[in-house]
A protein has these predicted regions:
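FMN-binding flavodoxin-like domain, especially the glycine-rich phosphate-binding loop
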Residues: 2-14, 58-151
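Short, surface-exposed beta-edge/turn micro-motifs
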Residues: 20-21, 57-59
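Conserved beta-strand scaffold positions in the cores of enzyme catalytic domains, especially
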Residues: 22, 43-45, 98, 125-126
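Short His-Asn-centered micro-motif
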Residues: 24-26, 46, 63, 101
């Protein structure tokens, strides 16, 4: 388990309102994009171009890949586009949870972007999956998100 993983108190978790909504980042390889399309939920993509912006005004769960070198190298784990998006207070305020992908070859830093964001925003880390994800990951994440949105 990452030492960056924190336990978010159930009293501090803000349950999302509205319909299931995902905000995600995907590089030009579109790996995360293809995964998101299989979830079949309302979604918005954080732009690759740092000059473009996305502003959220409704609750969402963030799904992001991890960029990291493994070992103790955590610097650069959260894509700079995601950092820019979350630097906007309004975008942070509507984030209700995070899901991250990564590569298990990187050991302790596998999907570390999730724990980093979870800790920074004090939102739950809902799930982590490897690389492109599997059909099982898609089914688990769908179930997690549907249950998370339930009243």
């Amino acid at each position: 388990m990452h030492n960056d993983v924190i336990k978010v108190s159930s009293e501090t978790i803000i349950k999302p309102k509205g319909i299931v909504n995902v905000v995600y980042f995907s590089s030009p390889s579109n790996n995360t994009h293809r995964f998101i399309q299989k979830l079949n939920f309302l979604n918005s993509r954080i732009p690759w171009n740092l000059d473009e912006e996305l502003e959220m005004n409704e609750d969402y769960v963030l799904i992001t890949p991890t960029y990291s070198g493994g070992g103790n190298l955590k610097e650069g784990a959260v894509p700079k586009q995601v950092i820019k998006f979350l630097n906007k207070k309004q975008n942070r305020n509507f984030c209700r949870g995070v899901i991250a992908s990564g590569n298990t070859n990187f050991g302790d830093t596998f999907a570390i972007a999730g724990p980093i964001i979870s800790k920074k925003l004090n939102v739950p880390l809902l799930y982590q999956f490897e690389l492109l994800g599997t059909q099982s990951d898609i089914e688990k994440i769908r179930e997690i998100l549907i249950n998370f949105w339930r009243k």
